[in-house]
Swiss-Prot record:
May participate in oleandomycin secretion during antibiotic production. The chain crosses the membrane at residues 27-47, 62-82, 91-111, 150-170, 194-214. Its main location: membrane. GO terms for cellular component: plasma membrane. This is Putative ABC transporter permease protein ORF1. Residues 23-214 form the ABC transmembrane type-1 domain. It comes from Streptomyces antibioticus.
Length: 229
């Protein structure tokens, strides 16, 4: 514990680099990535878990195989696609890349949670007159809350910490995310360890805060499932 705590390094870090604006960019990208990933992965994972068709098995195989290839191999095709869509140097384009990156693992995780939901609950809802959409939203999704929270956490942390794609796809300084701006502390004369360390420490706080926000949902959902079983 330092004998004389001071915020001088924090003030110096904010004075040297636009950390606040970069953190806002990262927060917008991470929240959008988490939201879109959950919205896409939840119904897809439900279909993969409940319908044992060839298409569902093919989708499951694609999820497994896609994890075997380094995502960096796709940077050139992604760059060309985003260039054609005029999404280079755009936070929207970066969100699309992160969603594509997060989806395979999110599908795999949520499909496992969906398989653990008893089919009898959905059958009971169908007997009561609920359709598939109503059953999904009113019965299945609440039981998938722990998996959805874990998926959102994974997508958020992935987007918040990612550096390579943000470096390649974002050129304008006012659109750069926090991991990219942190590298600006590195100069020809070395790294000013005090302000750089303070900035790096502050960069970890949003991920910890998001985890603290969703961890109760994850824990309570797991305990609820254990009691029901």
């Amino acid at each position: 514990i330092p004998r004389h705590p001071t915020l001088a390094n924090v003030r110096q870090a904010f004075a040297e680099q636009p950390l606040a604006h970069a953190a806002l960019n990262s927060l917008l990208v991470a929240l959008a990535t988490a939201a879109v990933t959950v919205l896409i992965a939840t119904p897809m994972a439900y279909v993969m878990a409940r319908h044992r068709t060839k298409a569902a098995r093919a989708a499951t195989g694609w999820v497994v195989v896609s994890q075997a290839f380094p995502f960096v191999l796709l940077i050139i095709p992604l760059f060309l696609v985003l260039k054609r869509l005029r999404l280079i140097d755009s936070l929207t384009g970066l969100v699309l890349v992160y969603v594509v990156w997060s989806l395979p693992f999110a599908l795999w995780m949520l499909a496992g949670h969906a398989r653990a939901v008893p089919a009898e609950l959905e059958e009971a809802a169908a007997v009561d007159g609920a359709g598939r959409v109503r059953t999904l939203t009113s019965v299945t999704v609440p039981l998938l809350a722990p998996g959805i929270a874990a998926t959102a956490l994974f997508a958020f942390v992935t987007a918040w910490n990612e550096f390579f794609f943000a470096l390649v796809l974002l050129k304008s300084p006012h659109r750069q995310t926090l991991p990219v701006v942190l590298t600006h502390f590195i100069g020809a004369e070395g790294v000013p360890t005090s302000p750089a360390g303070a900035a790096a420490f502050l960069a970890t706080l949003p991920s910890l805060a998001f985890f603290a926000l969703v961890q109760r949902r994850i824990t309570s959902g797991l305990l609820t499932g254990a009691v029901k079983n």
